[in-house]
């Protein structure tokens, strides 16, 4: 089921906040009011996951400059996130909140639960300030994601929101031309 253009479902969960070195409660309301990225991954203390989360951290300042809140989610507890943060060179760099979803509520809400394994799939969601999903990417376990591509998708989503009636073509980058769909473009692209 596609979540594109659908509002996120309610949830309440515990997260580890590395910036403050504390546990905190988060809900769907924390993903509203500004742009948000939710990055699901299978498990702490694993292999591809730390490379993805470190890559996401490497883009964190750019995401903050774009006004984007970043959250990672796995079916581990927030306690395990803290332990991983304290023991992994890659994960110790993370500044964004790490949500624990042992009940699998959020993972199910975003339709990324691998039922057989009981783990989250590799899913990334861009959520607008209204709490509506604007983009989604889901990869197989062995395929890591590229956070620089994510940054460009966010820029495109923000551009389209700020410029109604315009769309971003393939390979669009900030500053390049957008399209205005209409009869004058039919068959000319």
UniProtKB/Swiss-Prot annotation:
Q: Where in the cell is it found?
A: Cytoplasm
Q: Which GO terms describe its cellular component?
A: cytosol
What InterPro entries does the database record attribute to this sequence? AhpC, AhpC/TSA, Peroxiredoxin, Peroxiredoxin_AhpC-typ, Peroxiredoxin_C, Thioredoxin-like_sf, Thioredoxin_domain
SUPFAM superfamilies in UniProt: Thioredoxin-like
Domain of life of the organism encoding this protein? Bacteria
Taking the record's annotation, the residue ranges forming a coiled coil are: none
A Gene Ontology BP annotation from the UniProt entry:
cell redox homeostasis
Q: What else is known?
A: The active site is a conserved redox-active cysteine residue, the peroxidatic cysteine (C(P)), which makes the nucleophilic attack on the peroxide substrate. The peroxide oxidizes the C(P)-SH to cysteine sulfenic acid (C(P)-SOH), which then reacts with another cysteine residue, the resolving cysteine (C(R)), to form a disulfide bridge. The disulfide is subsequently reduced by an appropriate electron donor to complete the catalytic cycle. In this typical 2-Cys peroxiredoxin, C(R) is provided by the other dimeric subunit to form an intersubunit disulfide.
Assembly and partners? Answer: Homodimer; disulfide-linked, upon oxidation. 5 homodimers assemble to form a ring-like decamer.
According to UniProt, the name of this protein is: Alkyl hydroperoxide reductase C
Per the UniProt record, the lineage of the source organism begins with:
Bacteria, Bacillati, Bacillota, Bacilli, Bacillales
Gene expressing this chain: ahpC
């Amino acid at each position: 089921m596609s979540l594109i253009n659908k509002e996120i479902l309610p949830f309440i969960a515990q997260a580890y906040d590395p910036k403050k070195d504390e546990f905190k409660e988060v809900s769907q309301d924390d993903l509203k009011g500004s742009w948000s990225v939710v990055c699901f991954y299978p498990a702490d203390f694993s292999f591809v996951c730390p490379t993805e989360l470190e890559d996401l951290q490497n883009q964190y300042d750019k995401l903050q400059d774009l006004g984007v809140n970043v959250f990672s989610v796995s079916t581990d507890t927030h306690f395990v996130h803290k332990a991983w943060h304290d023991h992994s060179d890659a994960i110790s760099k993370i500044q964004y909140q790490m949500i624990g979803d042992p009940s699998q509520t959020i993972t199910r809400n975003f339709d990324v639960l691998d039922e057989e394994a009981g783990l989250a799939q590799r899913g990334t969601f861009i959520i607008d300030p209204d709490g509506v999903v604007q983009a989604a990417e889901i990869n197989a376990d062995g395929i890591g994601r590229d956070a620089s591509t994510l940054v460009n998708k966010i820029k495109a989503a923000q551009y389209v929101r700020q410029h109604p009636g315009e769309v971003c073509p393939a390979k669009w980058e900030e500053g390049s031309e957008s399209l205005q769909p209409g009869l004058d473009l039919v068959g000319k692209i």
